[in-house]
Amino acid sequence: MISRSLFARLLLAPLLAPPALGSEPGTMLAARVVEAAYVGTIAPLPPGAKRAEVWIPLPSTTPFQDIGDMKISTPFPATVEKDSAGNAVAHFTVEDATMLGGKEIEVRVTFRVRRAEVRAPLGRAAYGAPAPSKVPPDASPWLGENRMVPLTPRVRKQAAELAAGRRDAVEKAQAFYRYLVENGTYDKTTPGWGKGDSERFCDVKKGNCTDFHSAFMALARAEGIPVRFVIGFPINPESEGTVPGYHCWAEFWAEGAGWIPVDASDAAKSGDPEKRRYLFGNLDPDRVELSRGRDLTLSPKQKDGPLNFLIFPYVEVDGKAFSETKIRLEYKNA
């Protein structure tokens, strides 16, 4: 495997240039620093494959995580671009698939992350009186529909019923959160889970983190509240380990406070009332963000339609999506 780390670091500098940690509203308390490695494995390409393109999500610095010392290892030269939601993405091309000799492809992104706890100021005095008509330009893209998150008459009716009597974005979002936490079941056995299909979740009220937060997105957006989808990895409290799967959460926007996090699926899994209260407006530092957004257009643009969300390596073989990929996050406390 050929390391492209120096080339990638030079390209990453302008793409990952951060706002100051904690520059958005909210209070940072606990923090955690870990050395991490995102490992993506792509199964052997199908017989007869000629050309493949691969896109890899890269962690970015945000107001609540600092990313440093990033190194990208790929079997072919990679460039770093931004997708339609502003996520940093590494891209490389396999011009001749026979060069792989029927073997799998492994990509590895190592980095150091300082992740801070998020505590949003949920008091009314901090928020003022949010008004959907005053949504700032950078929040407006998060108001519309996604393919898996349509704003149907049913969801608009349900959102209006849940929001009745609520005075502002925070109270409405809290009503949606409580409804999902109290009525939803975290479940990865019922067919159709994991796609982030909000209509399915409304029908069965079961699913994983993607499904819970898609339902939250639909309800909040139906009431004119911007919501963005965030996906990454959970990090166990232990000092080191390997995480074989992703985790996601959401952030809604309220005037006077900015983006406020919610983790409805973790709350639904917990029977602890205090944890359920905490996960509306607060996040522990035991997670790493990889990307944001749904229906993503990558760079260079993929051929097989918008990408539902980005956490796995995205692969196109001769212009068609190839989904036989796996991920894991290896980490240890720094």
Predicted regions, residues:
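Hydrophobic h-region of N-terminal signal peptides that target proteins for export
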Residues: 12-21
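Low-complexity, Gly/Ser/Thr/Pro-rich intrinsically disordered linker/tail segments
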Residues: 283-334
